[in-house]
Amino acid sequence: VVKGPSCGEPVGESSHRPDLPFFTDYEKSKALADKIIDDYLDKGLEVMVARPTRVYGPGPLTEANSVTRLIKIYLKYRVSLILNQGHEIGNYVYVEDVAEGLELIMKKGRSGEDYILGGENVSLNKFYDMLEEVSGRKAIRLKISVPLALAVARLETAKARWLGFYPFITTSWVRTFLENWAFSHQKATAELGYK
């Protein structure tokens, strides 16, 4: 995430963030953590960084686990929520694959290196095609315009603040999903045996 969205080519560990603002506080916190890590590396501390992509699977249903929310909605209500036209690319990785990647980094990683722990680069449309195939369930494809998604996100955020729960959707989430986020985990595969 800290490397930013992909601009034509999958993002790798040596990629630099495009000249774009951070979409979420989560992204900002990762960038700040990188600066702290650099300071510790300069002091001789051994540090390896894991960079998971769009993780899904068991866990709290927060903004960071929004893909799992989409899967639950798909399975429960048989609805595919598609922002815009659903052509934007994301890199989806299962939480257990990330856990295995973390173990590999601890065993084989090199200090000062970062490793992208990713899965497949697919559009949201393709993601739902795969979900339909795996689950054996068809769902209605509900395409949501950007202005509508932003309006719903603002209302949801206000309601969540007032009632004290985590919002289902935020404006940051909407803006994030409007970009392409293709990543390459080639380095983790070559150096660590990550699959």
What residue ranges belong to the model's regions?
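Conserved sequence/active-site signature of Rossmann-fold short-chain dehydrogenase/reductase
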Residues: 2, 55-57, 98, 122
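Mid/C-terminal beta-alpha module of Rossmann-like enzyme folds, strongest
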Residues: 101-168, 185
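A conserved pocket-lining segment of Rossmann-fold NAD(P)-dependent short-chain dehydrogenase/reductase
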Residues: 17-21, 70-93
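Active-site helix of classical SDR
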Residues: 29
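Glycine-rich "substrate-gating" loop/helix at the edge of Rossmann-like oxidoreductase active sites
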Residues: 23-24, 53-64, 84-96
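Conserved Rossmann-fold NAD(P)-dependent oxidoreductase catalytic core, especially the SDR/UDP-sugar
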Residues: 1-26, 48
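Conserved beta-loop-beta element that borders a ligand/cofactor-binding pocket
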Residues: 35-58
